Structure formats: structure tokens, C-alpha cells
Amino acid sequence: MTHGGEPDLALLSAETARSVAETMQALAAPSRVRILSRLGVGACSVGELARELGMAQPAVSQQLRVLRHLGLVVGERDGRQMIYGLHDDHVRSLLSEAVSHTEHLRLGLAVHPGAQLQPA
């Protein structure tokens, strides 16, 4: 697969599957999902995230460390503070698709309109 192309999902190596699973674990914590969602609107500092999300600043910092380690967010120093943002549009798309899928299920829609099972 080249960057930007469609991956061949049938041919995931064990290493790729492990890496994808680690990335998807970021979405297993509601606090991290909320942080990613907020950063999807625009970059901001730890203090801003803490205030806007109603979280303790140390908790936000801890979650940002996890998200940085997974390559989902980046930080840039601005004077005495770090400003965080999404790594790239892939992260925004991943979160958007997860939210869309969850909402789809919540509404009880069995199959997305136009969706078809793909033959093996």
C-alpha cells in the first residue's frame, strides 16, 4: 500500500495488525476521544483542553502523552506552553468515521444505504 492509497485489508501482516490495534486503543478511552474531537476543531494548549473538557490538567497531559506516543497528536512549543493538534487529516477521518459508525448503530440502522457485502 502506498501512502494515500486504499489498503488491501486481506493482506495485513501481524505487525501491521498490531500497530492498527494499538492505534485503535486510543479510541477505547472516552477522555482521549474527547481530546481528539476538540483538537479536530483546532490546536490548543493543555490548559485550554482541561478547561473546555472539564478535566484535570494532569489527566489531560497524561492522555496527550499516550496520543503522542501513538502518533495521533503533535505538540509544538509556544513560549512556555505546548500547543497540541491532530497529527494529520487521517486522525480527523478516523475519528469522524468512528463517530459516524457509532451514531449509525445508535439509530438502529442495520446497513448503511448503498453498502454491500464484499466477496472474499
Label the model's feature ranges.
Residues 1-15, 19, 90-120:
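Amphipathic alpha-helical dimerization/coiled-coil segments
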Residues 35, 65-66:
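Hydrophobic side chains within alpha-helical segments
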Residues 14, 18-58, 78, 82-91:
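N-terminal helix-turn-helix DNA-binding core of bacterial DNA-binding proteins
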Residues 58, 63-64, 117-119:
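Intrinsic disorder/low-complexity segments enriched in polar/small residues
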Residues 51, 62, 68-69:
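Alpha-helical residues within the helix-turn-helix
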